C-alpha cells in the first residue's frame, strides 16, 4: 500500500469505476479502494434477497413464496441505458461490453388522466396512438419531422428557429402543439424532470429528442437497455477494465484520513499506511465536509408477482408520470424489470418508483405510481440525500462525484463523469477519438 499513484479512487460506484477505468486505459497508475466489502457503493445490486431485507431492517426475512434468495439481484438505484446514449458509448469505447449481456427494455409508457399509454416515438406509432386526436397527430408528425431533419450546422433546416435563442416554448407554439403533447414530448422523449426547460434555448431539447429517436431506431421496442444480473454488473465491468490496465483494487479497506498539504491532496491513510497520489476521485460519503446537500430522492422498491397492468404483459418497462398530471414540480418514474433479466425469482417482477422529494411526506408523493403497481407483495422505502461538491477540485485536486438523481437513465451521470474528467485532465473526454473498433452492445459491427 505504501506507494505512489497518479490517481487514488475512493468508492466503487459507477461514476468512480468508469473514471478509474478510463484513467487506467490512459496509462495512469490507479489505486481504487472501497470501505465496503462489495462493489457499487450507492449504485450496487443487492443479493441474495435476505440481504435486502436486512438492509431495510425487515428482520423476519423473505417468505418462501419469494423463491431462492440468490436468484435475486435488486438494484438500489433504478436506471436504464439509452441505446445510443453516452454510457453505451463509454462501454463501447472501453470494450467493457465484453463482460456484460444486455436486453432491450420492452416498452416505454406515459401516464395521462390516471391511465398509461405507450409513448409514441415514430411517425407510425404517433398516428396510431390514443394519446392525441387526429389534427394533433398531424401537427406532432410535422414536429417530429422537423426535429429529425434539424442540423445545428445547417441553417436551411432551422425553419425560422434560432437554436441558441428561440425558447422551446416558442417551438411548441410554432407547431401549435397542445399541453398533453408538450407534456410527453418534454418528459417522455426529452426526459426532463421539470418544466424549467421550456424557457431555455431549444437546441438541447431538440438534441435530447434526437437521442431518444436514435436510441429507439437502434433496437426497436424501446430506446432503453438493461444488463442481465442487474446494474451492479456495470461498475464491476469497469473495475475489471481498470485491473487489466494495471489498476490496483482493494475492497473492505477503511479510509482513515485524506492527507492534504498546503490545501492540495497528497495521499490517503488506511490502517496506518499511507498511499500517496497527485489526484483523488471519490463519492460524497468520503468527504462530507466538501459537499453540500442539494435535495432528496425517494425510491420505493416493490416486489410484484404480476406484470404491470396495461403494459401488454411486458417483462420490463418504464413509466413516466409527468408532473403536470399529478400537480407536482418533478416527474415520478417507474422502472420495472423481472426474472427475464436474472434479477428476480421465476415469475417475479421488481418495480422501482422514484421521484425528487418536494414535501414533508415523500411516500405520499409517489402514491400515483404505487397505484399502478397494485397488488404489491413487499415494499422497501429509501429516502436518500443528494449531495454535490462545493468546489471544482482545481486547487485541492480532490474530485467528488454527485449523488445519483431521480432520472431513470444515465445521461446525467455521464455528464458528471465527463465534467470530472475534463477538470482532471484539462481536456474534454472525446468519444470521437475512440481507439477501438465500433461495435454495438450486442457485439455486432455497425454498418
UniProtKB/Swiss-Prot annotation:
Q: What does this protein do?
A: Regulates the GDP/GTP exchange reaction of most Rab proteins by inhibiting the dissociation of GDP from them, and the subsequent binding of GTP to them. Promotes the dissociation of GDP-bound Rab proteins from the membrane and inhibits their activation. Promotes the dissociation of RAB1A, RAB3A, RAB5A and RAB10 from membranes.
Question: Can you state the subunit structure given in the record?
Answer: Interacts with RHOH. Interacts with the non-phosphorylated forms of RAB1A, RAB3A, RAB5A, RAB5B, RAB5C, RAB8A, RAB8B, RAB10, RAB12, RAB35, and RAB43.
Q: Which UniProt keywords apply?
A: Cytoplasm, Golgi apparatus, GTPase activation, Phosphoprotein
Put simply, this protein is called Rab GDP dissociation inhibitor alpha
Q: Which residues form a coiled coil?
A: none
Any one biological process term the GO annotation gives: negative regulation of axonogenesis
Q: Which residues carry this modification: Phosphoserine?
A: 427
- Gene Ontology molecular function, alphabetical: GTPase activator activity; Rab GDP-dissociation inhibitor activity
- Where in the cell does this protein reside? Cytoplasm; Golgi apparatus, trans-Golgi network
Amino acid at each position: 500500500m505504501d506507494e505512489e499513484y497518479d490517481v487514488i479512487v475512493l468508492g466503487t460506484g459507477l461514476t468512480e469505476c468508469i473514471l478509474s477505468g478510463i484513467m487506467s486505459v490512459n496509462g495512469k497508475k490507479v489505486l481504487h479502494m472501497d470501505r465496503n466489502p462489495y462493489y457499487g457503493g450507492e449504485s450496487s445490486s443487492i443479493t441474495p434477497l435476505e440481504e435486502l431485507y436486512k438492509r431495510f431492517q425487515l428482520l423476519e426475512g423473505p417468505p418462501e413464496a419469494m423463491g431462492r434468495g440468490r436468484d435475486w439481484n435488486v438494484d438500489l438505484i433504478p436506471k436504464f441505458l439509452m441505446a445510443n446514449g453516452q454510457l453505451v458509448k463509454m462501454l463501447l469505447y472501453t470494450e467493457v461490453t465484453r463482460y456484460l449481456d444486455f436486453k432491450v427494455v420492452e416498452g416505454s409508457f406515459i401516464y395521462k388522466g390516471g391511465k398509461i399509454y405507450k409513448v409514441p416515438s415514430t411517425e407510425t406509432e404517433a398516428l396510431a396512438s390514443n394519446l392525441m386526436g387526429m389534427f394533433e397527430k398531424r401537427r406532432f408528425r410535422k414536429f417530429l419531422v422537423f426535429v429529425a431533419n434539424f442540423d445545428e450546422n445547417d441553417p436551411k433546416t432551422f425553419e425560422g428557429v434560432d437554436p441558441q435563442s428561440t425558447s422551446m416554448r416558442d417551438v411548441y407554439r410554432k407547431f401549435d402543439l397542445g399541453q398533453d403533447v408538450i407534456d410527453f414530448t418534454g418528459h417522455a422523449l426529452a426526459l426532463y424532470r421539470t418544466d424549467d426547460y421550456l424557457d431555455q434555448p431549444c437546441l438541447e431539447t431538440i438534441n435530447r429528442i434526437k437521442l431518444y429517436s436514435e436510441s429507439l431506431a437502434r433496437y426497436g421496442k424501446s430506446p432503453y437497455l438493461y444488463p442481465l444480473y442487474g446494474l451492479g454488473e456495470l461498475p464491476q465491468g469497469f473495475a475489471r477494465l481498470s485491473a487489466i490496465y494495471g489498476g490496483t483494487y482493494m475492497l473492505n479497506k477503511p479510509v482513515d484520513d485524506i492527507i492534504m498539504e498546503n490545501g492540495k491532496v497528497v495521499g490517503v491513510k488506511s490502517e496506518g499506511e499511507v498511499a500517496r497520489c497527485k489526484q483523488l476521485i471519490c463519492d460524497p460519503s468520503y468527504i462530507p465536509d466538501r459537499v453540500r446537500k442539494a435535495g432528496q430522492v425517494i425510491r420505493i422498491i416493490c416486489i410484484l408477482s404480476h406484470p404491470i397492468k396495461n403494459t401488454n404483459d411486458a417483462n420490463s418497462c418504464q413509466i413516466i408520470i409527468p408532473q403536470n398530471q399529478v400537480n407536482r414540480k418533478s416527474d415520478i418514474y417507474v422502472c420495472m424489470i423481472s426474472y427475464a433479466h436474472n434479477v428476480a425469482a421465476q415469475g417475479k417482477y421488481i418495480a422501482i418508483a422514484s421521484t425528487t422529494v418536494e414535501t414533508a411526506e415523500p411516500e405520499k408523493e409517489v402514491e400515483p405510481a404505487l397505484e399502478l403497481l397494485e397488488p404489491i407483495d413487499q415494499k422497501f422505502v429509501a429516502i436518500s440525500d443528494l449531495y454535490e461538491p462545493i468546489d471544482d477540485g482545481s486547487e485541492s485536486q480532490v474530485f467528488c462525484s454527485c449523488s445519483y438523481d431521480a432520472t431513470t437513465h444515465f445521461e446525467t451521470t455521464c455528464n458528471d463523469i465527463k465534467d470530472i474528467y475534463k477538470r482532471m485532465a484539462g481536456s474534454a473526454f472525446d468519444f470521437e477519438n475512440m481507439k477501438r473498433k465500433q461495435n454495438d452492445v450486442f457485439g455486432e459491427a455497425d454498418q
